[in-house]
Amino acid sequence: MNILVTNDDGVTADGILCLARTLSKKYKVTVVAPETEQSAVGHAITLRLPLWLRKLDINENFEIYSVSGTPADCVKMGIDVVLGEKPDLLISGINRGNNLGTDVVYSGTVSGALEGAIAGVPSIAVSSYSFENPMYETAAKFILDFLEEFDVRSIPRFTALNINVPSVPYDQIKGWKLTRQSKRMYDDYFEKRVDPSGGNYYWMMGTIIEDDPDPKADYKAIAENYVSVTPISVFLTNEEYLKRLEERYEDKTIR
């Protein structure tokens, strides 16, 4: 199986190298990732600037390329320029820190996987829960084992798996659960600070809000030392609300 690997933490980040080294023991791996950190860039693509592609001279048993762009740029270039064909699987990660609830909207890691899904490639985003103490070896071993069990060819086009792995030793992982994207979000605020020259600047702060009653909420699996596996879609239409609107309103014609 040929696997294209990307991320948003940067091409030399510990998470992506750990994942690529682990996967390359069994699969053909090609890494195409941002040359600098692109965390929380969402699904941005580069339209008004050139993109630079460089092959890195690193002593690994896989090829590794940097792109002067976003994770979505990397996936596009990885498929069209580096490989010249679709890989069998795309994996984005391992992210430093979780991508749960509304994180998915902002995440470059998740967007890398969704870009693969748009291209018709079975795609997975994988994150290690703790930002302060990520355990990449646990997440990488889980993915290697997961690929033995899960038929990635069953993932429909325009769908990706968002996988979050508890940051604990592998022998403490209880298993994996199919979950839903939760309503986990942040209570954000901006702290006003003063720079050395006396000017004001702002730093975004916030606390996590976890009050989703759904027992299948993604973060609840993590709290019990289960890996959270959530199928997510490129499409954002609120089907339930659309149906209610259709029951109330007819199509309107402007005269």
Curated annotation (Swiss-Prot):
Keywords in alphabetical order: Cytoplasm, Hydrolase, Metal-binding, Nucleotide-binding
Origin organism lineage: Bacteria, Thermotogati, Thermotogota, Thermotogae, Thermotogales
One cellular component term from this protein's GO annotations in UniProt: cytoplasm
Enzyme class per UniProt: hydrolase
Compartment(s) of residence: Cytoplasm
Chief location category: cytoplasm
Residues annotated for a divalent metal cation binding in this entry: 8-9, 39, 95
A Pfam family matched in the record: SurE
Catalyzed reactions per annotation: a ribonucleoside 5'-phosphate + H2O = a ribonucleoside + phosphate
HAMAP family, sorted: SurE
Coiled-coil regions, chain positions: none
Record has Glycoprotein as a keyword: no
InterPro entries: SurE (IPR030048), SurE-like_Pase/nucleotidase (IPR002828), SurE-like_sf (IPR036523)
EC number of the protein: 3.1.3.5
Domain of life: Bacteria
Function per UniProt: Nucleotidase that shows phosphatase activity on nucleoside 5'-monophosphates.
Protein name in the entry: 5'-nucleotidase SurE
Record organism: Thermosipho africanus (strain TCF52B)
Cofactor names: a divalent metal cation
